[in-house]
Amino acid sequence: MSRSTLYVVTHFLCITASCAGLAATQSRAETYPARPVRLIVPFAPGGGTDIIARTLAPKATDAFAQPVVIDNRGGGGGTIGAELTVRATPDGYTLCLVSTSYATNAAIFKLPYNPITDIAPIALIGETGLLISLHPSVAARSVKELIAMAKARPDELNYASTGTGGNTHLVTELFNLKAGTRMTHVPYKGTGAAMSDLLGGQIQLIFGSLPSVLPLHRAGRLRGIGITSAKRNDAIPDIPAIAETVPGYAATVWYGLWGPKGLPAGIVSRWNTTVRRSLQLPDVKERLAGEGLAIADGPPQAFIDVVQRDVAKYREVVRAAKIDPVQ
């Protein structure tokens, strides 16, 4: 066989193999899902991320005609569930729904995965603020009064977080930096435990996700005094933004969906479309608007954009607050 003939045959075989690979990928996307999909929530039940997941999972179940099963894998501030997803086979049957803690963890932990390059982004779901929520025994009725109290009693006010390095931790440390206060961090293994101690009065406050604390604020069991987003939230317009008292302070919590790196583009596209359509359903819009969530509507890249933004932001918070990285 001549060199030219060998080249033609080899080139043909390469093209054939490539086309076969593309056809197989397309076929998988068209027949997907053929069995239940596991949606990992890297936190204990009851928190904002869990509530968002349980709102969207039934809609995805209807759209795909296969169960989308919530798998709560709490621990490590969300890193355990995230690593489990990163290590999963990229076939679309293991996905992960995360919050801002996914980015804040990268600012404080030495992670066994890269939160940007080791994943396949699917969709940004929405953004909102956290609510400074006080136990009723705390006398402060405003952000200004809380700052005055914290300055008069440095390190005496205890604030809860859902874990070291999580968004409830670093958003509060950003407040300490901007307001010139010192409040003591008490980390918990999830929202449920933190809220239990807050309601019991063992902890004085939390910068809590709206899905978790808003019902308690409305019931009078907690007192919300300030929202972390740059502007007031339409769900609670009577509560001022912290920035009205502390100029330049702003922090949001977002929710997003992703899968393991190598997830076929067709599966990513189907999930992105399903999430965006689900977010426009009247009952979903009403539920999430009631939780104060501003719904997103964009391509997978929108998720990566907010991750990159917040990894950089909270690395600076960790540095400025002199928080020791966790190895």
Regions found by a protein language model. Name each.
Residues 1-34, 326-327:
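Short, low-complexity disordered leader/linker segments with a strong preference
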Residues 25-118, 156-158, 164, 180-207, ...:
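N-terminal (or domain-start) structured segment
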Residues 34-36, 177-178, 218, 224, ...:
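An extracytoplasmic/periplasmic, membrane-proximal ligand-sensing/linker region
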Residues 51, 55, 59, 80, ...:
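Extracytoplasmic/secreted proteins, especially bacterial periplasmic and envelope-associated proteins
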Residues 87-93, 107-193, 242, 247, ...:
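Hinge/capping helix and adjacent helix->loop/strand transition within the periplasmic-binding protein
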Residues 101-110, 169, 176-178, 205-237:
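A ligand-binding cleft/hinge motif common to bilobed small-molecule-binding domains
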Residues 194-197, 234-238:
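Short, charged, surface-exposed secondary-structure boundary motifs
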